[in-house]
């Protein structure tokens, strides 16, 4: 099945501590999760690696969010939207279900 949310899509978070925040999808993971830029930040404790000249400390990173907790953002309606698929000129394209506009 084709992915409804892809890399570089602008999404809005539907549930969790970052609800109603918007961001760009940086990575889509095969286990049904996405990583969104600037959303779901966690603090990782990293050890120093002297061989690489890397200092240790606390590092903020984006954690994965389940794809069911994000929805694609429709810029014309300024709301979260659902995605549909249709064929145009023998190509499968994604479209917003609210206004039939191609993504």
Swiss-Prot record:
One of its GO terms (cellular component) is ribosome. Part of the 50S ribosomal subunit. GO terms for biological process: translation. One of two assembly initiator proteins, it binds directly to the 5'-end of the 23S rRNA, where it nucleates assembly of the 50S subunit. One of the proteins that surrounds the polypeptide exit tunnel on the outside of the subunit. The keyword Ribonucleoprotein applies. One of its GO terms (molecular function) is rRNA binding. Belongs to the universal ribosomal protein uL24 family. PROSITE patterns: RIBOSOMAL_L24 (PS01108). It comes from Haemophilus ducreyi (strain 35000HP / ATCC 700724). Keywords: Ribonucleoprotein, Ribosomal protein, RNA-binding, rRNA-binding. The gene is rplX. This is Large ribosomal subunit protein uL24.
